[in-house]
Amino acid sequence: MLLYTDEYWNDVDAVSKCIPNIDKLRGRTILITGATGMIGSAVVEILLHMNHTRNFHTKVILAGRSRSRIAKRFQLLVNNGDFSFLYYDADKGNLNTGTLKPDFIIHAASPADPHSFATKPVETMLANISGLVGLLDILKM
C-alpha cells in the first residue's frame, strides 16, 4: 500500500503549482486511462489533491481493467466521491462512456512494458494505436 505522508502531499502540491494553465481543468470532467500506472496515478493524485485543497471541482473518470485495483490503489481517496470508474482495456480499445462525457482525455494506458515489446512488438504497438483510436472516437461523439 502506498503511504500518503505529509511530505508526499507537499510534493504533490508543489508539482500542481508548476503546471501551466492548470486552471483550464477547473470544473471540467477528465477521463484518465491507465489510472493505476505510474503516470496515470500521479495525474489522478494531483487532480484529487486540487479538488480537496483548492476546490477545483474537477470530475475525474478513472478508466481501467479492475475497479478493485483502482479502489485499492486510491483507497485513502476513494471515499471522497471525486471520481467514477469505467471499465477499459487498452488492448481491446473497449470504452463506453455512456452518459459521462469528458471534456479532456488523458491517455496513460499502455501495454508498454519491456517484456511485451521484446516478445510481441507488433501486437503491443497495435494495442497502443487501437486504444488511442478508440479514445479519439469518443471525442467525435
Feature map (PLM): residue ranges:
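N-terminal Rossmann/SDR dinucleotide-binding element
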Residues: 1-104
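NAD(P)-cofactor binding segment of oxidoreductase domains
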Residues: 105, 119-141
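Conserved NAD(P)H cofactor-binding loop of Rossmann-fold oxidoreductase domains
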Residues: 108-112
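Conserved mid-core segment of classical short-chain dehydrogenase/reductases
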Residues: 113-119
